[in-house]
Structures are given as structure tokens and as C-alpha cells.
Swiss-Prot record:
GO biological process: positive regulation of potassium ion transmembrane transport; potassium ion transport
Descriptive protein name: Glutathione-regulated potassium-efflux system ancillary protein KefG
GO cellular component term, pick one: plasma membrane
Entry similarity comment: Belongs to the NAD(P)H dehydrogenase (quinone) family. KefG subfamily.
Molecular function via GO: electron transfer activity; FMN binding; NAD(P)H dehydrogenase (quinone) activity; NADH:ubiquinone reductase (non-electrogenic) activity; NADPH dehydrogenase (quinone) activity
EC number(s) reported in the record: 1.6.5.2
One Pfam family in the UniProt entry: Flavodoxin_2
Presence of the UniProt keyword Secreted in the record: no
Subunit and interaction comment: Interacts with KefB.
Reactions it catalyzes: a quinone + NADH + H(+) = a quinol + NAD(+); a quinone + NADPH + H(+) = a quinol + NADP(+)
UniProt superkingdom: Bacteria
Protein function: Regulatory subunit of a potassium efflux system that confers protection against electrophiles. Required for full activity of KefB.
Record membrane topology: Peripheral membrane protein
């Protein structure tokens, strides 16, 4: 008997999605996976008025939460930051009584506009990517979630189509068995 993969909520946040070839290439094959719910935050909330209860229910209904977004000013796009601050509320995801996400898994899937070598001590961006992404890892820990090492596509807009296709294939393979691959 084959086990069903865990339900995955893919929270996609890109304010200029139509211009992101890399993110389109990553998302296209993922949408065929039945156990993956792709939730485009900018499409759902163009006015930034987030339905907190709906979002919290989505989180309750899934075991793996993927945050796919570009790296903006060493963080995430504004709507995702708003989402994190509002949806992962004290009493729901953290603090007294806030255990709704305990034991779930968090993975960040990030595209960048810079080469990998620029993310190092003394490099253009001054710090390694693991330091830049530390606030997301800390947020996962605050919510009692398991942190899965991020998938990062460096210099995304300059990647060759075959390289992006390879990243998309690796992404789909991981999503088919997210708790046994890429930990």
C-alpha cells in the first residue's frame, strides 16, 4: 500500500508575478500535484485585506507549508510580511494557547536577483543566505514548526531555461515526498 503524501500549502507571494519567468517555471508543474494547494497571496489580496480566519484554516488543513517568494530587501514582499504578522497570531501559532502549527513543516523557496557568491561575509550582500533567512527560521521555531532547509534559486532572472527546468523538476520531486527529501 502506497502512503499518500502530506497535504502541502504553497503560499506564493510575488507582486510582479507576470514578470517572473523563474517563478512561473517553478509553479507550472507544481499545480498538477493533487496534494498541493497553490495559494497566490497577491491574487487573493490585491488590497492587502487578509481574511485571517480563512488563512488560519488553510494552515490547519495542511501539514507542510511552503513560502515561495522573491528575496526583497533581504526579506519577503510586503504582503507576505503582513500575512506573517497577522495570520501567525499570538494565541493561534505562538504564545499562550498558540499551538495550531505545532509539528508542521516550513520550507522557504526563494528566488534572488544576485549570484550565490554575493551572499557571503565580505561579499556584496555582506552575509551568507542562512543569516539573511534567519528571521524566517526563527518564526518557524516560534510557531513550533520544523524548519526544512530552503530551496534558493540565485540570480533567477539570468538562469538558462534548462537550468530553471532542472530546478522545477527538483521542486516537484521534493513536493512528491516533502518529508523524506531535502531535509
Amino acid at each position: 500500500m502506497m502512503l499518500q503524501p502530506p497535504k502541502v500549502l504553497l503560499l506564493y507571494a510575488h507582486p510582479e508575478s507576470q514578470d517572473s519567468v523563474a517563478n512561473r517555471v517553478l509553479l507550472q508543474p507544481v499545480q498538477q500535484l493533487e496534494h498541493v494547494t497553490v495559494h497566490d497571496l497577491y491574487a487573493h489580496y490585491p488590497d492587502f485585506f487578509i481574511d485571517i480566519h480563512h488563512e488560519q484554516q488553510l494552515l490547519r488543513d495542511h501539514q507542510v507549508i511552503v513560502f515561495q517568494h522573491p528575496l526583497y530587501t533581504y526579506s519577503c514582499p510586503a504582503l507576505l510580511k503582513e500575512w506573517l504578522d497577522r495570520v501567525l497570531a499570538r494565541g493561534f501559532a505562538n504564545g499562550v494557547g498558540g499551538h495550531a502549527l505545532t509539528g508542521k513543516h516550513w520550507r522557504s523557496v526563494i528566488t534572488t536577483g544576485e549570484q550565490e557568491g554575493t551572499y557571503r561575509i565580505g561579499g556584496y550582500n555582506r552575509y551568507p543566505m542562512e543569516d539573511i533567512l534567519r528571521p524566517f527560521e526563527l518564526t518557524a521555531a516560534m510557531c513550533h514548526m520544523h524548519w526544512i532547509n530552503p530551496m534558493i534559486i540565485y540570480w533567477a532572472r539570468r538562469q538558462k531555461p534548462e537550468t530553471l527546468a532542472s530546478h522545477a523538476q527538483a521542486y516537484v520531486q521534493w513536493l512528491q515526498s516533502p518529508l523524506t527529501r531535502g531535509l
